[in-house]
UniProtKB/Swiss-Prot annotation:
Lineage start: Eukaryota, Viridiplantae, Streptophyta, Embryophyta, Tracheophyta
Organism: Oryza sativa subsp. japonica
E.C. number(s) listed in UniProt: 2.3.1.-
Name the record gives this protein: Acyl transferase 1
Expression tissues: Highly expressed in young panicles. Expressed in leaf sheaths and panicles.
GO molecular function terms listed in the Swiss-Prot or TrEMBL record: acyltransferase activity, transferring groups other than amino-acyl groups; hydroxycinnamoyltransferase activity
Length: 485
């Protein structure tokens, strides 16, 4: 039985930094300043009280919400741009106004709430989708309007068991997933009693700009010619016409939101082992779980959407530039801006579906491992020119992100431990068109991966049939955890 509840919320307050902070204007990187990132990302995190962490125990606050509020105000002293506001400035480049951050210390939104439910009521194990998730988040208004608004909105919901839920909206132009996690980790550090965040924040957005990385390189990706076409089609009428044509040809763009459905697919060790068994030995041993599941999801999605065999389909893989692969352009520890680059794989739909799974896995691996400094520079240059990625002329694009490692060993309050969470089906729906790979534990306590998938309702039924064939499962219901509309 799915639990239902209503949270009792306090009035929202604007929480300012605990001490005076610099008043200045900060520039964003070219990756930060994408029009496609002008929205609020939504994240929820569930926490349980540690043993001995009941109210009144040494080190455990009687009121977690007030402790987190004080820690957030202190964290904003270090992350003071987050307490500011975005402003548009004219840009002569023809791609529209740029954003800058005015560090005004106006503050972020904070809400305290209570709910008459326990942590275990959200499910055992704790897996998405989360019931009544809207009750765990404060109202962000229009999540596509970011100029002149608070950049962070946080709600702390206290549960009957002593646990609590952090629910927040944060403007994606300010931080990516790792940056968001770093900010929340700083709050946890300070709530635990540390004198300063374990990792001090670094702004340095100039490191990911075309001016810094520019090499004049041409992006050798399937998007190169289309990116050039997007740049040359400066007429709004031409751009709007191209978008309408793409939407008409792609059910992902033409289906109304009320006819879409999100489902979450759980892959434990047994499912992953079965899929590896369909690969040659050399590939089965070296392929990561992310690469394997990405290939599987892309194939099933392509089949479910019924693309013609000659149509080109694309896979866009979000990669973290803080990773070991990026030894050529290292980012300093503490960098919390957008540092994701997104190489693209492309294939004809008929070829993708007609060839063995191993070929798709190989394509995914080549795409990931082909992200050189030259390609990274070319992508940043393209983003600087178009202010978006992928170019709006692209269609039939499936984006995947691996966020399994953003919460590992993070969020240690001392008196509370992270129990689960991630990106829920709430807030801006257009940001949920891709798939997120999240780490969790299944009912047997085994480390597993949950992958989200948003599709038109009719296509979802076909998707589950394709997945059942790959996993050799008769019961398609056993493939998913639960669906969300």
């Amino acid at each position: 039985m799915v639990v239902t509840f209503t949270s009792r919320r306090s009035e929202p307050v604007l929480l300012r930094p605990a001490r005076p902070t610099p008043r200045e204007t900060k520039q964003l990187s070219d990756l930060d300043d994408q029009r496609t990132l002008r929205y609020y990302e939504t994240v929820v995190g569930f926490f349980r009280r540690c043993d001995g962490g009941a109210a009144g125990a040494v080190g455990a606050p009687a009121d977690p919400a007030k402790a987190i509020r004080a820690a957030l105000a202190e964290a904003l002293v270090y992350y003071y741009p987050v307490a500011g506001r975005l402003r548009e400035v004219a840009d002569g480049g023809g791609a529209g106004n740029r954003l800058v951050v005015d560090c005004t210390a106006e503050g972020v939104v904070f809400v305290e709430a209570d709910a008459d439910v326990r942590l275990e009521d959200f499910g055992q194990p704790l897996l998405p989708p989360y019931p009544c998730v809207g009750e765990l988040l404060c109202d962000a208004g229009d999540t596509r309007a970011v100029v002149g608004k608070p950049l962070l909105l946080m709600q702390v919901t206290q549960l009957k068991c002593g646990g609590f839920v952090l629910g927040f909206h944060i403007c994606h132009n300010i931080a990516d997933g790792f940056g968001m996690a770093q900010l929340i980790m700083a709050i946890a550090d300070l709530a635990r009693g540390e004198p300063a965040p374990t990792i001090l924040p670094v702004w340095r957005r100039d490191l990911l700009t075309a001016a810094r990385l520019g090499s004049g390189a041409v992006a050798r990706t399937p998007f190169a010619s289309a990116a050039a076409a997007s740049a040359s089609a400066s007429s709004p009428a031409l751009q709007n016409g191209a978008r309408r044509a793409a939407a008409a040809a792609d059910a992902m763009l033409s289906t109304p939101p009320d006819r879409m459905v999100v489902e979450y697919f759980l892959f434990g060790p047994r499912e992953v082992s079965y899929l590896r068994g369909q690969l040659p030995a050399h590939l089965a041993d070296s392929t990561t779980v992310f690469e394997l599941l990405t290939a599987v999801m892309w194939r099933c999605r392509t089949a479910a959407l019924g693309y013609g065999p000659d149509l080109r389909v694309r896979l866009m893989i979000t990669m973290n530039a803080r990773g070991r692969w990026n030894a050529h352009t290292p980012l300093p520890r503490g960098f919390y801006g957008n540092a994701h680059v997104s190489p693209v794989a492309e294939a004809a739909a008929g070829d993708l579906l007609g060839r063995p799974l191993a070929d798709t896995v190989e394509l995914v691996r080549r795409t990931k491992r082909g992200m050189t400094r030259e390609r990274m520079s070319a992508m940043v240059e393209t983003v600087a020119q178009l202010r978006e990625w992928p170019p709006s002329s692209m269609d039939r694009v499936y984006e995947v992100s691996d966020i399994k490692w953003t919460t590992v060993n993070l969020l240690k309050f001392g008196w509370a431990e992270f129990a689960g969470g991630g990106i829920p089906l709430a807030g801006d729906l257009t940001s949920k068109l891709g798939s997120d790979h999240t780490r969790c534990k299944n009912s047997a306590g085994e480390v597993s991966t949950v992958v989200s998938m948003l599709l038109p309702r009719v296509a979802m039924a076909r998707f589950k049939k394709e997945m059942a064939v790959l996993l050799n499962k008769d019961d398609k219901k056993s493939l998913t955890i639960m669906s969300s509309l």
